[in-house]
Amino acid sequence: MYDFSYKNSDKILKGSKESEDFLIFVKRLLPRWANGIPDSECIAIFKVLNSLRKKQKKQLVLLETGSGASTLAMFLHCALFGGTMYSWDINASKGSFLRSVISDSIGKILKVDVNKIWNFIPFNSTDPNVGIRVLKELKRKADFCFFDSWHTL
């Protein structure tokens, strides 16, 4: 479905401006219901992750509640520089859709397996059994969190 030829795929690996252009290229392929943040916010997330990685000098563990375009930014960062990400979203269909998009676009071009980087949990992040507190049991500590699920607080 998202099988395409990106013009400068060899430059994406260098983590240059081309990485950001590629991120926006893939983001704009998403339907509106999966693309809820502006391009500038998506790029900002990607840049913050790059800065954080350089500062901490390690592969990052990323966490998000809700999924969508932010997932693309976080996944691209992990695909380029290493790392793991965890996403909680009660909409399992959305997670499945995003996994397909990521696999067909970013995964195919960068030759990475989405399942080795991204852990999608189709439950409420506050669930006592499978919510965010599971990371403690896994002895994982998040380096960056993006909370973008319920907008009713």
Predicted regions and their residues:
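A short alpha-helical cap/connector motif
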Residues: 1-145, 150-153
